[in-house]
Swiss-Prot record:
This is Nitrogen permease reactivator protein. It comes from Saccharomyces cerevisiae (strain ATCC 204508 / S288c) (Baker's yeast). Residues 1-68, 151-188, 234-258, 276-357, 666-704, 766-790 are annotated as: Disordered. Changing residue 257 to A: Abolishes autophosphorylation. Residues 677-688 have a biased composition (Basic and acidic residues).
């Protein structure tokens, strides 16, 4: 029995004989020699938690070094007692913790006292590296210093920790794996919790994190009749409200949501309005073609239209594939467009839009009979009855107008169906699109979403690509049509990356919606078809495509329609992705929920197999698959297969030799869990399969080697991961960019040079340039037709 244990027992006997009241801590005095005793033997013979503190100078307390000849106080805390210490106790109140508390809350205790230089024995004592207890009774200098150091290191580490991109924050999902919403929600909650524990170290432990941005409304079985408002009452109330506000100098309207503002960005329906207002300092110009306003009563739909799915745009031929460029431009909305009407007699009603601006800038515009008016004069604009959603309905013949405010310009147009469509441009001169741009007539391409033509800006003679969206189908609702256009435009204006096309503005003129984008001199498909690309040039273009995909995935977007047709390249060798009509959001910031995509979109040769098999799928591995097919096309100058279905013999051979008879089983495979012993995993033999498709690595005509053997050897590993039939087993974009071959590619890129960017070209290659007659898909189609006619 150690001397320290014997002293403790004697102290306990003395207290029992004296019949002293029970306290939570007892004090005894020991000699300095007792401090060198084995702590483990002491713990084995004692059921209490002991802590040692020196009563010498604070400097020696910080170093936790005993002073020769000094008196050391040993304090015990009974494990069966949770009450606080008495006034005569030598322990400070804030340092009195029972063993049950320490055992149950060791994680908190270790963090509080700092465990970087301390360990903990099995009875809960905090032991430092020198073998002495590290909890001070009074001064607590050493513990306090450890706490401060630990807190500072934690703070600095937290502040320097980078939030991960959304591309790798959620593991790849098996198609149709989120059938059970409850299990999905529980999994996402646990994932979100682990994410917060990893990347939100400064967050208190006693709060609950919000892991979803979706707030559900309460469900109501029935509505009492007294709460039901008819359309007539709603219209009458709106009319009365407008008449009451007629004497006010300014009116403020607010839309209910951001999506309604985007919808009103193009269309607004007005009914009769009559009120007086003062204009707010703007000039505008209008071009009218015989307006004959006949005001209609607003029509309100009772049911909400389901969110439309992207239209299937599948083309087996590369020449007829869709080419719908959109782009990237960081757009700041300073105001919301409002309808302006000219050339109307004062007795006729003029519709007025009733939606608010995103930048909370509300303005009224003056009615005038001239094309341009000063903002100093007051004009009367009759107002009608807006609907509760902020939509009003006009009905007159074709007319268009354009107005400017400061550095922003807006155009307002009307068609025969009573639609009001707005456009917003930055730094516009306040004149219509046809007077600011000249269409050269050269076609760049056409597809299901519209056609793309060249246009020259009159002010500086700069060339742009103008996409003219298709007209609304007869069986297509206006809501679906507007949603498709607004989503594509808003995605384009949100993106800002050198490898993403830039969107300049969107306007409406002559019943057609036009989107102005930056112009790139060549289509990547035309460059590939010229058969002049070197291997280094192909690698440069491939890495630039992957860089653009990495940017999209990092912000939670997936393209879903990657192909050679949707890649353009400028004369400086910078590749840019276009056409975001099929793009979807797969994840939102600070959320671990995966939003699965649905629908078959894209061109057949580039489609991933899960898109053709399952209704819902993770869109990220779809982009990875399509990127690999693009690389194979650039190398082989042909498609590996026409469509990823078993009826295609080439794809069937690609799926063969995998020890499985079902394509669905191959697609739904999951990655093997990591083995704790690599040597054991290599020695483990796989069970023999009874499948008819036995794998044969030496046969280059079946299995993945059917495609990989035609590619350069250094590319086979990473491309093989990108074309894995199972989307859950494919490499994510972060892993692909870290591949040694990808990292070794000398890619042309842009670097910031003051207020502009300069191109850093790759040293091992030059980018191919072709004649402009063959630089775009439209030119190749003309050449092909001419050859067929001959």
């Amino acid at each position: 029995m150690s001397s320290l244990t014997r002293l403790l027992q004697e102290k306990r006997k003395n207290e029992t004989s004296n019949s002293s009241p029970r306290t939570s801590a007892d004090t005894l005095t020991t000699t300095p020699e007792s401090q060198s005793l084995d702590l483990h033997s002491r713990n084995k013979s004692s059921s209490h938690i002991g802590s040692v503190s020196n009563s010498s100078s604070s400097d020696r307390n910080r170093a936790n070094v005993p002073v020769p000849g000094s008196v050391t106080t040993v304090t015990q805390i009974y494990s069966e007692e949770d009450s606080s210490s008495t006034a005569g106790s030598s322990l400070d109140d804030r340092n009195q913790f029972s063993s049950s508390f320490l055992n149950a809350n060791f994680a908190h205790t270790a963090s509080f006292y700092g465990t970087s230089a301390q360990s903990r024995d099995r009875f809960g004592s905090l032991i430092n590296d020198q073998g002495t207890a590290g909890l001070s009774s009074h001064g607590g200098s050493f513990a306090a210093q450890n706490r401060i150091t630990s807190r500072l290191s934690t703070t600095s580490h937290t502040s320097g920790r980078a939030i991960p991109s959304l591309s790798s924050s959620i593991p790849y999902s098996v198609p149709n794996s989120n059938k059970d919403n409850n299990s999905s929600n529980s999994n996402s909650s646990s994932l979100s919790s682990s994410w917060l524990e990893t990347y939100a170290g400064g967050m208190p432990n006693n709060i609950s994190a919000i892991d979803s941005n979706v707030i559900s409304s309460p469900k109501v079985d029935s509505v009492e009749p007294r709460f039901v408002i008819s359309k007539q009452k709603l219209q009458k109330a709106s009319m009365d409200s407008n008449n009451a506000n007629a004497t006010q100098s300014r009116s403020i309207s607010r839309s209910g949501s951001f999506s309604s503002q985007l919808g009103n960005f193009f269309f607004s329906k007005n009914s009769k309005e009559s009120s007086n207002s003062n204009s707010a300092g703007m000039s505008f110009s209008a071009n009218s073609n015989g307006p004959s306003p006949n005001i209609k009563n607003p029509n309100v739909t009772n049911g909400s239209t389901p969110i439309p799915k992207p239209i299937r745009a599948r083309q087996s031929s590369i020449y007829s594939a869709s080419r719908q460029p959109t782009g990237s431009y960081t757009d700041n909305f300073y105001g919301s467009p409002s309808s302006v009407h000219d050339h109307l007699p004062p007795s006729q009603s003029v519709p007025r839009s009733q939606h608010s601006s995103i930048g909370d800038l509300k303005r009224f515009f003056k009615k005038s009979s001239n094309s341009n008016l000063s903002s100093n004069s007051n004009n009367v604009i009759p107002n009608g009855s807006p609907l509760s959603s902020g939509i009003a309905v006009p009905s007159h013949s074709h007319s268009s107008s354009h107005f400017a405010a400061g550095n922003n310009s807006y155009s307002t147009s009307y068609n025969g169906n009573g639609d009001t469509i707005y456009s917003h441009s930055h730094g516009g001169s306040g004149i219509p699109f046809s007077k600011r741009y000249i269409k050269t007539g050269a076609d760049l391409g056409a597809g299901a979403g519209g056609s793309v033509k060249l246009a020259q800006r009159i002010s500086d003679n700069k060339i742009f690509a103008v996409k003219e969206f298709r007209t609304k189908f007869e069986n297509e609702s206006k809501r679906d049509y507007v949603k498709k256009i607004t989503s594509e435009y808003c995605i384009g204006t949100t993106l800002n990356h050198p490898n993403i096309i830039e969107t300049i503005e969107i306007v409406y003129e002559n019943d057609r919606i036009l989107q102005v984008m930056e112009y790139c001199e060549y289509d990547l498909f035309a460059i590939v078809m010229s058969n002049k690309m070197s291997y280094e040039e192909i690698c440069c273009c491939f890495k630039q495509i992957l860089t653009g995909v990495q940017y999209l995935h990092s912000i939670g977007l997936a393209h879903r329609d990657l192909k050679l047709d949707n890649c353009v390249i400028n004369e400086k060798g910078i590749v840019k992705l276009i056409d975001f009509g099929a793009a979807v959001v797969f994840s939102y910031p600070f959320s671990k929920n995966l939003v699965e995509a649905s629908g078959i979109v894209g061109s057949d040769p580039y489609l991933a197999p899960e898109v053709c098999i399952f209704a819902k799928y993770d869109p990220r591995p779809v982009d990875i698959w399509s990127s690999a097919i693009i690389f194979a096309c650039m190398i082989l100058k042909k498609f590996p297969w026409k469509i990823p279905k078993l009826r295609d013999n080439s794809f069937k051979l690609f799926c063969s030799g995998r020890d499985c008879d079902s394509l669905s089983s191959l697609v739904t495979r999951t990655p093997d869990p990591p083995s704790y012993d690599e040597s054991h995993s290599t020695e483990k033999k796989k069970p023999e399969s009874s499948s008819n498709n036995v794998s044969d690595p030496n046969n280059v005509n079946i299995g993945p080697q059917r495609l990989l053997h035609s590619l350069p050897e250094e590319t086979q590993h990473i491309v093989g991961r990108m074309i894995d039939l199972a989307p859950a087993c494919r490499g994510n974009i972060e892993e692909i960019m870290e591949d040694p071959w990808i990292r070794s590619i000398d890619m042309c890129h842009l670097v910031e040079d003051g207020l502009s960017f300069k191109v850093v070209r790759g040293e091992d290659h030059h980018h191919t340039q072709v004649d402009q007659s063959e630089a775009h898909i439209a030119g190749l189609e003309k050449k092909k037709k001419k050859q067929n006619n001959q």
